[in-house]
């Protein structure tokens, strides 16, 4: 029997699990500190999405409106438990974030991609905006456009 994956909005009760997942999955310099995660849950509940099975957090995606362009979301984190990588969870979370962007009428989702993830984000519908410096190495500024927003314009 297969256990279904649920995509839900993050809540304050998820904070300890989110912190534990990022501690196991990210280098220390890329981890968000507790009060920033808590503030993100409070301010960005619509765009802080979790992938869960029955009783375990498997991954999350965090995006919020860009301060200088509030019609666009900026994706800050996409974190998947190491035991569940390469099973489509990241793609599932990105699809859920795109769905939220459409529902909330965001024009686009932007992200910064390191070289090694460029093809992954391209596979998920993001295009390279421009080559940029990212985390002291070459990286890419990528964007996904809301197709429904483009149709209306």
Q: For the regions a protein language model found, what residue spans apply to each?
A:
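Active-site rim helix/loop that mediates acceptor-substrate recognition in acyltransferases
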Residues: 26-53, 62
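A conserved beta-turn-beta hairpin within the catalytic core of GNAT-like acetyltransferases
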Residues: 65-76, 85, 135-138
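C-terminal "cap" of GNAT-fold acetyltransferases
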Residues: 49, 114-115, 124, 134-153
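Conserved acetyl-CoA-binding loop-helix of GNAT-fold acetyltransferases
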Residues: 80, 86-99
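Conserved beta-strand in the GNAT
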Residues: 50, 56-65, 72-74, 79
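A short beta-loop-alpha structural element at the N-terminal edge
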Residues: 4-18
